[in-house]
């Protein structure tokens, strides 16, 4: 058997292992050293392949594919700095528990550390940002080595999915010639069935917790990203306990559509500034903290009181930012909630009533204020939210876009995505396009600011290449709007603008033209809604620009808080805003 046949059989066995453990998509960054894997993946009918010449964009695109499909996705690149460009997306995937299978190809050992071109140290290059690293053996065609190749493929993809899900990295040293034998058929008939368990509490432990919470005034706080089925369980638990439910927007609880009164959608606008008549005796947290800073500050204050904190840690990593929980519960979240639903009992109705009163007051202020406000970043964000269909997918950028929705949106059924692992603005466009590639016939919308769009403009090429009908709503305040809400806003203008305001002064109509997207700048809320509603019925690749003013956003937010404060105080509740 010659080199070409040996390499082909070895790599085909590896790909069989990937398929066996659930891989259905691969994103390929073109290059020479990766030629055999790229060709064999491309020819594999069971794996859908995408090609992106920009490695950073490719990695975030794979991230979006995996987020939306909830399956492992392969990333493949050549040797050298190509692999380094995957780094930001791998870091995000690690923190947000997304299963990427990263395949880097490499020079063989005799060409390392001798000055060979396009060669660098790729061993353990992603360090502790991946949960598994494998330096693959050079291809051999013995039965033992074919089994080895299959096993590493099956193991890698399975490992990436196991709780806590995270990226894995396999590095392939390959010798020339690099062209595989495309006429050969797979020789691996091996199959591996995976039965994965989960962390679960005993019936006695669940009953013990239910007893501790009986007739206690409690709050459920849910962070992280969740499916509709998971969100349903959290809502059912809050209803069974008659406790308020505070959730991150990406938890898809507010966007669940069940419209349950226990879901407190606007807590960010009154927590930590309104003094509740009764404080919670129990706080039960699931996953990471929500995006709301006011929820975080309120919880930090409660942690100094007699309030008992419980932290449900599905991943077993003790990622408890407050470090104040007296009880850590290591269990699969959904299973734990299902167990609780069989034993918990509701608390007194007066506890939830104070939350409902505050929620009603805030909702009335928002309805009156925002309906009377012309088009700006806040009302544009709400227009996007209000025009989402039940099966629609909305990707929300970091910085201000997700905060507008967190503060102001009401209950409406659709699925929301975002990159809230490390919260960067890099790769947002590419991740959103990965999301849309999973369901291209559905409504797919990206809500994004001008800095984030500029940062990932290369990602737009994927929409052009694969005809992905993503509607991009661009909130353009010509710079970094979030800093107008932070302490940096007190700086002199000649310090603030170049370092934090960072105006771009870009004509985004030219960006849309470059990548083949239709473009419109809208001036009214009605015009924006009309375009969004049309796009929901007939999706297309387009950029809708809303030009805003950074200071106007701040003034609107402050005026809303002031009006909420006035009404809350008239109800006899102390307001510290």
Swiss-Prot record:
Task: Give the protein's cofactors.
Answer: Mg(2+); Mn(2+); thiamine diphosphate
InterPro entries cross-referenced by the UniProt entry: DHS-like_NAD/FAD-binding_dom, MenaQ_synth_MenD, MenD_middle, THDP-binding, Thiamin_PyroP_enz_TPP-bd_dom, TPP_enzyme_TPP-bd
Task: Give its E.C. classification number.
Answer: 2.2.1.9
Keywords from the named record: Magnesium, Manganese, Menaquinone biosynthesis, Metal-binding, Thiamine pyrophosphate, Transferase
Query: Which Pfam family is one of those matched by this entry?
Result: TPP_enzyme_M_2
Summarize subunit and interaction data from the UniProt record for this chain: Homodimer.
Name it: 2-succinyl-5-enolpyruvyl-6-hydroxy-3-cyclohexene-1-carboxylate synthase
Q: Which reaction does it catalyse?
A: isochorismate + 2-oxoglutarate + H(+) = 5-enolpyruvoyl-6-hydroxy-2-succinyl-cyclohex-3-ene-1-carboxylate + CO2
Which top-level enzyme class is recorded in the Swiss-Prot or TrEMBL entry? transferase
Originating species: Enterococcus faecalis (strain ATCC 700802 / V583)
State the superkingdom: Bacteria
PANTHER family hit by this protein? 2-SUCCINYL-5-ENOLPYRUVYL-6-HYDROXY-3-CYCLOHEXENE-1-CARBOXYLATE SYNTHASE, PROTEIN PHYLLO, CHLOROPLASTIC
* Gene3D superfamilies named in the record: 3.40.50.970, TPP-binding domain (3.40.50.1220)
Q: GO terms for biological process?
A: menaquinone biosynthetic process
Q: What functional role does this protein have?
A: Catalyzes the thiamine diphosphate-dependent decarboxylation of 2-oxoglutarate and the subsequent addition of the resulting succinic semialdehyde-thiamine pyrophosphate anion to isochorismate to yield 2-succinyl-5-enolpyruvyl-6-hydroxy-3-cyclohexene-1-carboxylate (SEPHCHC).
Which pathway does it serve?
A: Quinol/quinone metabolism; 1,4-dihydroxy-2-naphthoate biosynthesis; 1,4-dihydroxy-2-naphthoate from chorismate: step 2/7; Quinol/quinone metabolism; menaquinone biosynthesis
């Amino acid at each position: 058997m010659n080199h070409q046949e040996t390499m082909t059989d070895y790599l085909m066995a590896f790909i069989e292992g990937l398929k066996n453990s659930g891989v259905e998509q691969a994103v390929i960054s073109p290059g020479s050293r990766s030629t055999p894997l790229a060709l064999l993946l491309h020819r594999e009918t069971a794996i859908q392949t995408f090609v992106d010449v920009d490695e950073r964009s490719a990695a975030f695109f794979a991230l979006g594919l995996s987020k939306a499909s909830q399956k492992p996705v392969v990333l493949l690149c050549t040797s050298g700095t190509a692999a380094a460009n995957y780094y930001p997306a791998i870091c995000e995937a690690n923190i947000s528990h997304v299963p990427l299978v990263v395949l880097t190809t490499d020079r063989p050992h005799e060409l390392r550390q001798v000055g060979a071109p396009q060669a660098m140290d790729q061993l353990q290059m992603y360090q502790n940002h991946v949960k598994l690293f494998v330096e693959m053996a050079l291809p051999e065609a013995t039965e033992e080595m074919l089994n080895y190749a299959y096993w590493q493929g099956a193991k890698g993809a399975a490992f990436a999915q196991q709780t806590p899900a995270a990226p894995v990295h396999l590095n392939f040293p390959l010798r020339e010639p690099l062209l595989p034998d495309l006429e050969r058929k797979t020789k691996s008939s091996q199959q591996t069935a995976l039965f994965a368990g989960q962390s679960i509490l005993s019936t006695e432990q669940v009953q013990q917790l239910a007893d501790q919470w009986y007739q206690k005034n409690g709050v459920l706080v849910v962070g992280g990203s969740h499916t509709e089925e998971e969100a349903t369980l959290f809502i059912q638990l809050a209803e069974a306990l008659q406790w308020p439910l505070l959730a991150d927007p990406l938890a898809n609880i507010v966007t669940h559509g069940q419209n349950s009164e226990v879901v407190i959608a606007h807590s960010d606008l009154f927590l930590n500034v309104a003094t509740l008549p009764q404080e919670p005796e129990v706080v039960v947290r699931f996953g990471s903290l929500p995006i709301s800073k006011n929820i975080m500050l309120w919880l930090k204050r409660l942690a100094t009181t007699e309030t008992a904190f419980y932290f449900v840690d599905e991943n077993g990593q003790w990622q408890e930012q407050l470090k104040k929980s007296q009880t850590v519960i290591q269990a699969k979240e959904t299973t734990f909630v299902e167990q609780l639903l069989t034993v918990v009992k509701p608390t007194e109705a007066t506890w939830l009533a104070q939350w409902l009163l505050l929620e009603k007051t805030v909702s009335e202020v928002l309805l009156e204020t925002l309906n009377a406000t012309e088009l700006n970043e806040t009302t544009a964000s709400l227009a996007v939210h209000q025009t989402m269909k039940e099966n629609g997918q909305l990707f929300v950028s970091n910085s201000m876009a997700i905060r507008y929705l967190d503060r102001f949106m009401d209950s409406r059924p659709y699925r929301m995505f975002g990159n809230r692992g490390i919260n960067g603005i890099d790769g947002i466009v590419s991740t959103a396009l990965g999301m849309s590639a999973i369901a291209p016939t559905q409504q797919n919308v990206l809500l994004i600011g001008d800095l984030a769009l500029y940062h990932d403009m290369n990602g737009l090429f994927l929409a052009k290449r694969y005809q992905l009908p993503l509607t991009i709503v661009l909130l353009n305040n010509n710079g970094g709007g979030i800093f107008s809400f932070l302490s940096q806003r007190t700086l002199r203008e000649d310090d603030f603008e170049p370092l934090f305001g960072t105006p771009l002064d870009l004509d985004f109509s030219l960006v849309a033209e470059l990548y083949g997207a239709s473009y419109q700048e809208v001036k009214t809320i009605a015009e924006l809604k009309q375009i969004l509603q049309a796009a929901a019925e007939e999706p297309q690749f387009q950029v809708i620009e809303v030009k805003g003013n950074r200071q106007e956003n701040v003034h609107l937010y402050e005026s809303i808080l002031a009006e909420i404060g006035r009404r809350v105080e008239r109800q006899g509740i102390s307001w510290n805003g």
